[in-house]
Amino acid sequence: MTQPATTPRPVLVVDFGAQYAQLIARRVREASIYSEVVPHSATVKEIKAKNPAALILSGGPSSVYADGAPQLKPELLELGVPVFGICYGFQAMNHALGGNVAQTGDREYGRTEITHTGGVLHDGLEENHKVWMSHGDAVDKAPEGFTVTASSAGAPVAAMECVAKQMAGVQYHPEVMHSPHGQEVLVRFLTEVAGLEQTWTSANIAQQLIDDVRAQIGPEGRAICGLSGGVDSAVAAALVQRAIGDRLTCVFVDHGLLRAGEREQVEKDFVASTGAKLITAHEADAFLSKLAGVTDPEAKRKAIGAEFIRSFERAVAQALEESPEDSTVDFLVQGTLYPDVVESGGGDGTANIKSHHNVGGLPDDVEFELVEPLRLLFKDEVRAVGRELGLPEEIVARQPFPGPGLGIRIIGEVTEERLEILRQADLIARTELTNAGLDGDIWQCPVVLLADVRSVGVQGDGRTYGHPIVLRPVSSEDAMTADWTRVPYDVLEKISTRITNEVNDVNRVVVDITSKPPGTIEWE
């Protein structure tokens, strides 16, 4: 899908190799200002063509003096747009403007106290407060015309600004939650130094995306969307349905690996709230047949993926055959998000793909043009747009769920009996976490069945050998990193008691308290 014509002028985050570049863009958007990420290798011409409202120079792992270190193009500072430097970007900006970056040998990593002397960025904040530092080199002299507004033990110039030039920067990372006042500082740059308006709201986003989809598909075009039951595909489908009405057909493949109530939720709640046409393919038997005897995690993923391709192909072929008016479907809707675009090297331009490229396995003589209405959004924005469109909270607030479903939450062979055990345990855990009001604190809570493990237990007057269930509650902002959620003991006790009493063949419940890294969120 091409860059929407209605997208506002972006605040461009120039990525110098930072692990937080996407997070910076998210923080800008949280301030109701549109932002995108561009690589530092982008030419001045390419950046200028995006008509940026401001530039933010991200952090990075390098020293400005290191061989091969990413370079700031000085011409970017001459575009006449506001510029904000963070960490490495702060040093690179200083270096380019004639300040001095010293290799002091005094490194600062983690929580660090800074002392500020006012200025626009820090005015009104505590004179001494904690920020998150991650630097080796340090700026010891600001460029001419800049006012030094903060310092730390290892950074003589920890913040500087020149309001007249609409330029500022900080040595620390304002985008991370370990800098408690970081978002305030970022917003002050955007609104008070750069003078930008805060107009990027869920209502505006939704209407812009609807208009863009309507323009792409046209007055007579037809589209197909594969629903997974997740929030991304649901919101993408709702946007397209709002744009083209009954010219959209949704296909939902029930592979038998769903959690309790998920198929019904799609068939009832989604259809009721959108009015979309829906075809459900009941393919549980086909998937279980392919998974018989398979225990290797990667082999399971591949088997599920390959069978999904075939199932989706059959469902689409059936839809085209049963609805002659849909035989000229030219568009395929997908719930691609902005992090996917950035991580894949993203680029603009219409994506015309062979049908087997992304969902795979469609007839070779069928070509679709991709419609990706969410390709500029982060997950939290997708949820906000979903609420704006009137989707039920059960769909919008749904925790992330892997495509292979419960198939990769059973450690061992996947069977119908084991799926039923896991569904019951998962439903109990989800219900009790919701009842405890913890849905807002937990990014997701995989429930895992150790099907190949037999744990000894005592129930009643006899010894039992049952399977352990693992609870994996994690908190995260983007799933790139995660911490285990500190669920109150009384809630854990209730979950454990219910599972061991109500679910057959389970006699032990354990909690996974591993952060990511080193552990991934899913077990397989």
Curated annotation (Swiss-Prot):
Location of the active site: 87, 173, 175
Record's keyword terms, sorted: ATP-binding, Glutamine amidotransferase, GMP biosynthesis, Ligase, Nucleotide-binding, Purine biosynthesis
Pathway(s) served: Purine metabolism; GMP biosynthesis; GMP from XMP (L-Gln route): step 1/1
Pfam family, one: NAD_synthase
InterPro entries: Class_I_gatase-like, GATASE, GMP_synth_C, GMP_synth_GATase, GMP_synthase, GMPS_ATP_PPase_dom, NAD/GMP_synthase, Rossmann-like_a/b/a_fold
Enzyme class per UniProt: ligase
Gene3D superfamilies named among the record's database cross-references: 3.30.300.10, 3.40.50.880, HUPs
UniProt EC number: 6.3.5.2
Signal peptide coordinates: none
Residue ranges constituting the GMPS ATP-PPase domain according to the UniProt record: 200-398
Annotated positions binding ATP: 228-234
Domain Glutamine amidotransferase type-1: from-to ranges: 10-199
UniProt keyword annotation of Cell inner membrane present: no
GTP-binding listed as a keyword: no
Entry GO CC: cytosol
CDD domains tied to this protein: GATase1_GMP_Synthase (cd01742), GMP_synthase_C (cd01997)
Catalytic activity annotation: XMP + L-glutamine + ATP + H2O = GMP + L-glutamate + AMP + diphosphate + 2 H(+)
GO molecular function: ATP binding; GMP synthase activity
Function: Catalyzes the synthesis of GMP from XMP.
Quaternary structure and partners: Homodimer.
HAMAP family: GMP_synthase
Cross-referenced PANTHER family: GMP SYNTHASE [GLUTAMINE-HYDROLYZING], GMP SYNTHASE-RELATED
Name of the protein described by the UniProt record: GMP synthase [glutamine-hydrolyzing]
